[in-house]
Design a protein with these regions (language model features):
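C-terminal and inter-domain tail/linker signature
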Residues: 1-139
Length: 139
């Protein structure tokens, strides 16, 4: 399987809310995570991020979905980029406020680096969190 195939399978597992259990097969043990987005700025591992996504999508944003706009792979850095659109409505419990019934349609990018063992070794999420939080009525 190519590195792009691994990155793509990981992306779909994470965004399909499979959490750590569904994503671990694609992820290196020490895979780091980074995001300059307030809700996830303190998340430091890829698998912890996968669990965060699962909690968000099975809790306050139950029924959320995503669409990939574009995907590419840079062989020189072993990094896949996924530009996607996340859509979710705050209808479930677990958010910072009671369910608002408001929806966000939020652009984001995953930069997923795959190592020579064909495992995700690093991930960066680029996301305008304040936009999404405002649309959801959370700020």
């Amino acid at each position: 399987m190519s590195k792009m195939d691994i990155a793509t399978k990981f992306f779909h597992a994470c965004e399909s809310l499979e959490g750590r259990a569904g994503c671990a097969q694609y992820v290196a043990d020490d895979a780091g995570f980074n995001a300059q987005s307030e809700p996830i700025a303190d998340v430091t591992t890829v698998l912890d991020y996968c669990d965060w996504m699962q909690g968000l999508g099975q809790g306050p944003l139950n029924g959320c979905n995503y669409d990939i706009v574009s995907a590419s792979f840079d062989e020189s850095t072993s990094t896949a980029l996924f530009f996607a659109v996340f859509t979710g409505m705050h209808i479930g419990d677990g958010g910072p406020v009671a369910p608002t019934g408001q929806t966000t349609t939020s652009h984001y990018v995953y930069a997923v680096t795959v190592n020579d063992d064909n495992k995700v070794s690093q991930m960066v999420k680029i996301w305008n969190a304040p936009w999404a939080l405002k649309e959801l009525g959370w700020v």
